[in-house]
Regions:
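A short, conserved, highly charged catalytic patch centered on acidic carboxylates
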Residues: 2-4, 11, 16-21, 25-151, ...
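Short, conserved secondary-structure transition motifs
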Residues: 156-163
Length: 211
């Protein structure tokens, strides 16, 4: 068993989690993007959607977005793609993650704390929720070994649509909003807020609805 084998909402019972919903990022401002980056992304997004494969969306949309975010934040965070993340194989907390963001800028080795897990899906967001949540639990356990902050964020994205999640303790909170690629500045603003808040050790809580 591995991350990809976890379904949703079955992952809740399998890993002993509770689910909630909240407007996690209400009021987070859009990040100002350069005209050159916006123009380049306009063409790459069109190309990725025309090819319409998970690989194309990952290469032409998701990777450039995360790379530009790292540049805008001064390279203060690590960015890993397609890495094996084996934490506890006995519980299925192992496998490959599409993208991992870490608070450390070190790129030679994956170090705690892992802040964000990003999983790319070609078909629909819901199909990636179980896999993403399992990877978030693995990240939480990985961080705990070095006494790092317990809050982990996850993102499931098709490239054109983005869904954010937060894990704190045994509670997974799903953002009630979905963000679309036309709101790229807002998506990158949320990612920047997650990363900079993690750097300061503060993540603001939002009122939530338990499921």
């Amino acid at each position: 068993m591995a991350f990809r084998d976890f379904g949703f909402p079955e992952v809740q019972q399998t890993l002993g989690l509770t689910l909630a919903e909240a407007d996690l990022f209400r009021g987070v401002p859009a990040l100002e993007l350069s005209p050159a980056f916006s123009e380049r992304m306009h063409g790459d997004i069109a190309l990725a959607l025309a090819i319409n494969t998970e690989k194309a969306r990952s290469e032409f949309i998701i990777a450039p977005v995360l790379s530009e975010l790292r540049r805008l934040l001064g390279g203060r965070f690590g960015l890993f793609s397609g890495v094996e993340f084996d934490v506890d194989a006995s519980r299925g907390l192992n496998g490959y993650c599409d993208f991992i963001l870490t608070r450390s800028p070190l790129q030679s080795v994956l170090t705690a704390p892992v802040v964000t897990i990003v999983e790319a899906k070609n078909d629909n967001l819901r199909s990636g929720l179980g896999q993403c949540i399992a990877a978030m639990v693995a990240a939480q356990e990985f961080n705990a070994k070095s006494s790092s902050p317990a809050i982990v964020h996850g993102v499931v994205t098709t490239g054109s649509a983005w869904k954010f999640l937060r894990l704190e303790g045994a509670e997974v909170t799903l953002d009630v909003e979905e963000y679309f690629i036309a709101e790229l500045g807002r998506i990158m603003g949320i990612l920047a807020q997650i990363l900079t808040a993690a750097e300061m050790g503060t993540i603001a809580a939002r009122p939530r609805l338990n499921l």
